[in-house]
A protein has these predicted regions:
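Glycine-rich phosphate/nucleotide-binding loop
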Residues: 34-42, 123-215
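Short glycine/serine/threonine-rich phosphate/pyrophosphate-binding segments
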Residues: 12-26, 88-89, 137-140, 167-168, ...
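Glycine-rich oxoanion-binding loops at beta->alpha junctions
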Residues: 1-9, 49-52, 110-123, 155-158
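Conserved small/polar residues in nucleotide/adenosyl-binding loops
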Residues: 236-238
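Acidic/polar active-site rim loop that often engages polyanionic ligands
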Residues: 34-48, 73-76
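N-terminal glycine-rich phosphate/adenylate-binding segment common to multiple enzyme folds
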Residues: 1-38
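Active-site rim loops that border cofactor/substrate pockets in soluble metabolic enzymes
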Residues: 88-148
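Glycine-rich phosphate/diphosphate-binding loop of Rossmann-like nucleotide-binding domains
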Residues: 53-108
Length: 238
């Protein structure tokens, strides 16, 4: 499969497992149960960064790339209420203030805001739900297999393509529990990404994010993370 992708025999592939490098992770696509809305889940497998918050910032860009390539010109972004959500929100809003084109969703809860809760997951409030890959993986499993009581995944498009800066192999991930409808969905998802030139969309999106100061924001995040890591190490007694 890897040889066929490398030499251009195939434009994309659907598989259960793939060793994505650090910095590349997958953007899932589900059908939410309350209103039947499609929602991209950024991200579901792989590791965007060793730092959780940096990873969620990158996941947002990966999700925007997938959504735009699939025809959503101005996708809305929501951040799932998990550890690091507020720091991610702050960084993304700084990116937005610097000129990066990002539209935040409003939670269905009365207090609104772009940090999403459980009801927003079920209703598909944002076009893109940003989270860490472990939580995103669970979300896809639950939403895809809800109708079967968890016995197999019957709806949606699987765990999605691996996306990362400079990465140009279209590999779509499904699981052992993915039923025929999900496999078919993953193939349709891949075809859409190929036809609409996902790698060109990715280049443009990364360029826009860099122009808006993505590197500076990520560097500041790394600097902020160092004291916390040092403090944790100081508590370890050998």
């Amino acid at each position: 499969m890897e040889e066929m992708l490398a030499n251009g025999e195939v434009d994309g592939a659907v598989t259960m497992h793939f060793p994505f490098p650090i910095g590349v992770s997958t953007v899932g696509r589900v059908v939410t149960p309350a209103k039947g809305r499609e929602m991209f889940v950024a991200n579901t497998t792989g590791t965007s960064s060793a730092d959780r918050i940096e990873g969620m910032i990158k996941n947002t860009i990966y999700g925007i790339i997938a959504a735009k390539t699939c025809g959503i010109a101005n996708p809305t972004v929501g951040i799932l209420n998990v550890d690091g959500a507020r720091q991610t929100e702050k960084a993304l809003k700084e990116l937005q203030e610097n000129g990066y084109d990002i539209t935040f969703a409003e939670s269905a809860r009365a207090d609104g805001g772009c940090v999403m809760r459980g009801n927003d997951v079920l209703q598909g409030t944002p076009d893109i739900m940003v989270t860490d890959s472990l939580t995103g993986n669970i979300m896809v499993k639950m939403l895809s297999s809800a109708a079967t009581g968890g016995s197999f995944e019957a709806t949606g498009y699987g765990y999605g393509p691996g996306i990362g800066e400079g990465y140009e192999q279209l590999v779509m991930i499904v699981s052992r529990a993915s039923g025929a409808p999900v496999i078919a969905g993953a193939i349709r998802y891949a075809a859409q990404l190929v036809r609409n030139k996902v790698f060109e969309v990715a280049k443009a999106e990364f360029a826009a994010a860099k122009k808006a100061g993505l590197k500076k924001i990520l560097d500041a995040r790394k600097a902020a993370a160092k004291p916390a890591a040092a403090e944790e190490l100081s508590l370890i007694h050998i």
